[in-house]
A protein has these predicted regions:
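A short, charged, Gly/Pro-tolerant segment at domain boundaries
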Residues: 139-149, 163-165
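Internal alpha-helical scaffold of NAD(P)-dependent oxidoreductase catalytic cores
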Residues: 3-90
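Amphipathic alpha-helical coiled-coil segments
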Residues: 149-157
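Interdomain hinge/lid region at the active-site interface
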Residues: 74-143
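A conserved regulatory-domain signal marking ACT and ACT-like small-molecule sensing domains
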Residues: 156, 164-176
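Amphipathic alpha-helical interaction surfaces
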Residues: 57-60, 94, 123, 149
Length: 176
């Protein structure tokens, strides 16, 4: 019964949408306990491309790469995969039909984020190749701090209120 309690619902009304219709939809989701916010559709697509679509695509890809390497490593990739690989690749167990459709329908934003990710990955490759420990340390320190801020925001748990005990569903409007 609490499937939507404390969860985000992002409305993406196109320009010209009847404000009363948006208000009714907002009320509907609020009544289900969702945290409702509005976003421009193109902005929504970019945000979801980086925080949802890209992680799924990368997980599918790394599982495929590991499987391809099985013959080279004599079946030791899967054999020795531990919790890090398991946790990271959990997303690859998602519905392939849904992710095919997501990729086809949000391809521009996904391709933009893949391009950015590829640039960042190339930066990481160069730092490793050149033995640039300072760049590696700076990158890992910065991104660890970002990950910790995600935990502090309560976004790292499946709990209905993201682990914020006693948190109430709130109506959040864009720009607040």
């Amino acid at each position: 019964a609490g499937l939507f309690t404390g969860r985000w619902c992002i409305l993406t009304p196109p320009s010209g949408t009847d404000p009363d219709a948006v208000a009714r939809l907002r009320e509907f989701w609020n009544a289900l306990g969702s945290r409702v916010e509005e976003m421009d559709p193109a902005h929504h697509d970019k945000v979801l491309a980086i925080v949802s679509h890209l992680p799924h695509i990368i997980a599918y890809n790394i599982v495929g790469t590991a499987d391809d390497l099985e013959t080279v490593t004599e079946s030791e990739v899967i054999k020795y995969s531990a919790s890090g690989f398991r946790d990271f690749t959990r997303l690859a167990s998602s519905d392939p039909t849904m992710w095919r459709d997501v990729c086809l329908h949000n391809k521009d934003a996904i391709l933009e984020m893949l391009s950015r990710f590829s640039e960042d990955l190339a930066y990481l490759q160069r730092a490793i190749r050149w033995g640039d420990g300072e760049k590696l340390f700076d990158l890992f320190t910065r991104t660890r701090a970002i990950r910790r801020s995600i935990i502090e925001a309560g976004q790292d748990t499946a709990a209905p209120d993201f682990g914020r005990h006693g948190a109430q569903s709130v109506d959040i409007k864009a720009g607040e």
